[in-house]
């Protein structure tokens, strides 16, 4: 009897499970245009007033008791879809901005809570870029610029007019570039020609300044998302922004692109392969040849890129898997040389050769059915570079010049350089990077609302295996510079570990929707001496975004939505290898400089000090952001506006640090040149011991960058009668640059044949505010019947302004020649020596400099031929301009711009 009861219970339980399974529906929601999953879409079953379920991070949802009923699927930025509930169905949502197949040639604001712009392939093709730098024109606040490929191109997000010096380069260093999930690391880049003072060499340096955008080709890119706001805690080692690049995959087309403009020529070739078993392979190469002036063949820049990308997808009833493997080569080559006919037959050159080899792979697996575990992703990436910078100069000296190569503290006689020689200095750098990352996503199945929990960790290693500076110390390229050799491979590797967690919630409240994304990231540097501050703790980054979507409204039978969003968060960028381990400074002080008409009797004696330039108190740069935004959609029209503020008070900068150094001043007046048979001996030669202040450069957290502004974008739907859409975007930026730590300054005044022996310590030495406002009006027309598309863009720069803030003329304290620090007292300005520490900045130094309105008109056109296999495109920037003259004080400033145009040919077979 008991067995029968147990059997009946099991039978009834099984039947209930079967009935429940039959009433449970699992389906997929994707974008109709891109076939990408829609995450967080709400599903409402007929008869219910609130959402029954939300799609997960794979775009899937599961609902019960809905068989045969209608369901309504809705998501911000897409048209509502009402359809019959069916198991294993795929529902496609149509964007309210663009119809299927419609060409969008401008950047679009992302649907995410943080401020971000998405640039699709169509927009890049219409823009006709030569490098990634050209894409920044599409951002709010962006403007077209002539390509400048003879120097590194750094990214500066949300800045008005950045200073040209490197003291505020943390903004570009702190912008992370991620290509197919793998970050591009520049932390081991130490490719700097030491001692160089010529613009020819220094203008091509990119140490501690982030990614050089010239090196990134755009032809393989399928989509770019540039996050200016608060990114996910998944991404770290950044302060200013995030650039996520996704490259093309699949297809079977053979593509070729040829482009020529006023400064460069570009060739691109790519072939895609796609097999039935879901394997894909993409091969591509591109070559760019640029000249700053086409008439000058002595200054060139070349870029070569080769890429092989493979992938495969697997699917079963429970999971969807995706594997990707990328192999990449990138070469970047700068070259400048002088004309021997203008240099007395001597050729002078400067060359750089950057060769980057990269491999990356990723594997992801996602659950199709709803449950606690949703997805897992693992990424492994590595890159290796072989970089050289080489300078050759013909040296002509006018006087006896010493060369010192003592590697330790002490006294020595200098080698006397010949008056004429040819010298070469080379930098050998071999940066290596290894990156690993794992992510796991969980979701708590709760009826009526969507949630996901992201847990992850990443590890990053950077090291440079190069030889460093290679030169002949007795034939220096830059005489009178205290230069020594150091092998870069002897510097320890940087190891950074981070772990993070982030919760994402979408919750319906009445007919509203609340979105919350909050997380925390902890990062720490390892393999570093415990005496360094950065080795003692984890640095937390807390980031939070929230959005509130109001109920859908209806005006004139048209529907619209309004969303308000808010974001706040901190962002951390760790110091680079060059900043943590700067090479020693060498101070060579001349003690005796005896000249004799006979070269064999000359003698220069020097005192050498080896100066440790390491700053163990150096901390990561940290940026605190907040932003408020609104996004309004109505009948295909969209308006978004963002108010933001960013305050980074601990940016990296190089500061002078003074200390006293003693040396001997020999009195050579008693030497009888007529009795010498050898260089004069120092024994018995009278001397005076002198103490003097000398400086060494040290990296500190002394730069503050304050960004404030408004960004906005308005786009219309395409007006069918004229086939035209209007896009208006622009920004107002106000940026303040100043030092956030005290600065030491030694006046150049001379008293009694000596430079002033005191150093003033000032609370401020650099306070500059820049401002700009612009608006771009773009009308793009697409006529499918004629296979013709063109756009006209009126780029209005309403004004730019800069103003230095008042600086303190009187120091807070000062250092005497012995190294003692004294507080500044009232009346010190009357002291015969100390009065030279009082700076004299007149009011004109602080005048606001305003450049008034200017307008550029740009034109682009594309024409498809031969059944879309051939595409001819042309652009002309500054086709027409309005740049009136203006006055700055009493000075008349005349402005003039030149058009810049180009033509390209695209073939698809």
Which residues make up each language-model segment?
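C-terminal beta-signal and adjacent terminal beta-strands/loops
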Residues: 7, 648-650, 654-656, 796-839, ...
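Structural signature of Gram-negative outer-membrane beta-barrels, strongest in the C-terminal barrel
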Residues: 490-638, 642-647
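Gram-negative outer-membrane beta-barrel transporters
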Residues: 510-511, 665-808
């Amino acid at each position: 009897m008991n067995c029968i009861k147990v059997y009946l219970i099991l039978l009834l339980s099984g039947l209930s499970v079967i009935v429940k399974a039959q009433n449970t529906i699992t389906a997929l929601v994707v974008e109709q245009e891109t076939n990408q999953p829609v995450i967080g879409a709400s599903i409402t079953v007929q008869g219910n007033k609130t959402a029954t379920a939300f799609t997960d991070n794979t775009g899937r949802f599961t609902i019960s008791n809905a068989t045969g009923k209608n369901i309504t699927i809705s998501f911000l930025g897409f048209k509502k879809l009402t359809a019959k509930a069916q198991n294993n169905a795929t529902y496609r949502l149509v964007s309210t901005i663009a119809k299927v197949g419609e060409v969008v040639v401008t950047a679009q604001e992302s649907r995410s809570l943080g401020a971000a712009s998405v640039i699709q392939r169509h927009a890049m093709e219409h823009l006709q870029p030569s490098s990634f730098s050209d894409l920044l024109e599409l951002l709010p606040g962006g403007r077209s610029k002539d390509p400048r490929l003879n120097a590194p191109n750094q990214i500066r997000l949300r800045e008005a007019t950045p200073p040209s010096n490197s003291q505020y380069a943390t903004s570009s260093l702190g912008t992370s570039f991620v290509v197919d999930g793998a970050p591009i690391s520049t932390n081991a880049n130490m490719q700097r020609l030491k001692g160089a003072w010529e613009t020819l060499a220094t203008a091509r340096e990119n140490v501690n300044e982030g990614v050089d955008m010239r090196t990134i080709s755009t032809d393989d890119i399928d989509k770019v998302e540039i996050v200016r706001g608060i990114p996910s805690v998944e991404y770290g080692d950044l302060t200013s922004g995030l650039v996520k690049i996704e490259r093309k995959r699949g297809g079977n087309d053979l593509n070729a692109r040829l482009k020529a403009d006023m400064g460069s020529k570009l060739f691109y070739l790519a072939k895609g392969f796609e097999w039935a078993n879901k394997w894909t392979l993409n091969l591509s190469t591109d070559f760019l040849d640029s000249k700053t002036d086409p008439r000058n063949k002595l200054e060139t820049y070349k870029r070569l890129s080769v890429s092989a990308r493979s992938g495969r997808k697997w699917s079963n009833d429970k999971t969807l898997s995706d594997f990707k493997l990328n192999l990449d080569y990138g070469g970047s080559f700068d070259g400048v040389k002088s004309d021997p006919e203008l240099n007395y037959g001597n050729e002078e050159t400067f060359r750089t050769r950057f060769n980057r080899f990269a491999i990356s792979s990723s594997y992801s697996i996602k659950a199709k059915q709803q449950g606690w575990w949703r997805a897992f992703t693992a990424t492994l990436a590595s890159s290796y570079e072989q970089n050289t910078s080489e300078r050759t100069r013909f040296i002509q000296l006018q006087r006896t010049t010493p060369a010192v190569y003592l590697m330790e503290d002490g006294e020595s006689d200098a080698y006397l350089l010949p008056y004429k020689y040819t010298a070469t200095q080379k930098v050998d750098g071999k940066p290596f990077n290894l990156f690993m990352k794992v992510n796991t996503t969980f979701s708590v199945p709760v009826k009526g609302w969507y949630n996901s929990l992201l847990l992850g960790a990443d590890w990053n290693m950077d090291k440079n295996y190069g030889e460093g500076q290679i030169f002949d110390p007795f034939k220096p390229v830059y005489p009178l510079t205290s230069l020594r050799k150091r092998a870069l491979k002897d510097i320890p590797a940087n190891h950074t570990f981070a772990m993070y967690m982030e919760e994402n919630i979408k919750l319906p409240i009445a007919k509203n929707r609340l979105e919350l994304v909050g997380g925390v990231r902890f990062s720490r540097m390892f393999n570093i001496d415990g005496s360094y501050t950065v080795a003692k703790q984890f640095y937390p980054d807390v980031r939070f975004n929230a959005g509130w979507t109001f109920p859908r409204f209806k005006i004139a039978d048209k529907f619209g939505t309004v969303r308000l969003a808010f974001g706040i968060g901190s962002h951390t960028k760790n110091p680079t290898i060059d900043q943590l381990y700067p090479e020693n400074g060498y101070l060579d002080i001349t003690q005796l400089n005896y000249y004799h008409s006979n070269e064999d009797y000359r003698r220069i004696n020097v005192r050498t000090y080896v100066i440790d330039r390491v700053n163990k108190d150096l901390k990561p740069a940290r940026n605190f952001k907040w932003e408020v935004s609104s996004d309004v959609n109505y009948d295909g029209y969209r308006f978004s506006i963002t108010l933001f503020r960013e305050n980074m008070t601990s940016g990296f900068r190089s500061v002078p640090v003074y200390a006293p150094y003693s040396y001997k001043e020999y009195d050579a007046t008693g030497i009888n040149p007529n009795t010498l048979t050898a260089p004069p001996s120092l024994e018995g030669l009278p001397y005076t011991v002198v103490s003097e202040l000398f400086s060494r450069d040290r990296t500190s957290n002394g730069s503050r960058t304050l960004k404030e502004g408004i960004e906005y974008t308005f786009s219309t739907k395409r007006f069918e009668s004229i086939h035209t859409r209007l896009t208006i975007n622009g920004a107002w930026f106000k940026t303040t640059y100043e030092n956030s730590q005290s600065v030491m300054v030694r006046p150049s005044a001379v008293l009694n044949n000596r430079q002033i022996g005191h150093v003033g310590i000032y609370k401020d030495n650099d306070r500059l505010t820049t401002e700009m406002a612009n608006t771009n009006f773009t009308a793009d027309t697409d006529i499918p019947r004629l296979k013709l598309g063109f756009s006209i863009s009126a780029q209005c720069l309403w004004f730019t302004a800069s103003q230095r803030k008042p600086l303190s003329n009187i120091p807070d304290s000062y250092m005497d020649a012995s190294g003692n620090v004294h507080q500044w007292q009232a009346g010190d300005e009357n002291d015969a020596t100390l009065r030279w520490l009082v700076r004299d900045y007149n009011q004109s130094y602080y005048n606001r400099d305003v450049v008034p309105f200017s307008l550029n008109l740009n034109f682009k056109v594309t024409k498809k031929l031969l059944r879309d296999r051939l595409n001819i495109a042309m652009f002309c920037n500054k086709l027409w301009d309005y740049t009136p003259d203006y006055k700055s004080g009493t000075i008349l400033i005349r402005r003039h711009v030149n058009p810049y145009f180009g033509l390209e040919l695209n073939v698809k077979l």
